[in-house]
Amino acid sequence: MMSIEMDPLVILGRVFSNEPLERTMYMIVIWVGLLLLSPDNWPEYVNERIGIPHVWHVFVFALAFSLAINVHRLSAIASARYKRFKLRKRIKMQNDKVRSVIQNLTEEQSMVLCAALNEGRKYVVTSKQFPYISELIELGVLNKTFSRWNGKHILFPIEDIYWTELVASYDPYNIEIKPRPISK
């Protein structure tokens, strides 16, 4: 029977070939730190009690490996939660801005948008660019970049973020926009 003797570095290489590099680096730093910070008599005491050579180093290695995995998972979870928090905050601020703009629309601006909402169109149709349409473009409610001529009329698309809020706050019975409250 032929025995195969493997170098410890080859064994470690095979173990860590499937591990992410970041986790491996955490593990090495934790392992070396634990070995350096542990008192000198602990390895001797453990070896005497158990009788297996270098069991202390293997134990510390296993501990470092477990800590590295948990640190890696915790940092990934914390990072994902932080990103979700920032996204929710950005969406909330954007919704508040949209609601604020809709709340402060003049009567003429509101009527222009009501005409489009009443007909179910996602754009405003006009024969020329009136001052209140220019104001809606400046507010960002209408998109001038994608406006197009349709015969004698100009079509100004309503921005998507405003469209969803306008549809939610539109009252078709009274043909008016009832702004929803801004969140606090």
Swiss-Prot record:
Offer a single GO CC term for the protein.
Answer: membrane
Write out the entry's keywords from A to Z: Host membrane, Membrane, Transmembrane, Transmembrane helix
Query: What is the topology of this protein in the membrane according to its UniProt annotation?
Result: Multi-pass membrane protein
Q: Which domain of life is it from?
A: Viruses
Compartments it resides in: Host membrane
Q: Which spans are transmembrane here?
A: 23-39, 55-71
- Primary localisation category: host cell
Query: Which purpose does this protein serve, as stated in its record?
Result: Has a role in the prevention of superinfection by phages that are insensitive to repression.
What protein does this entry describe? Superinfection exclusion protein B
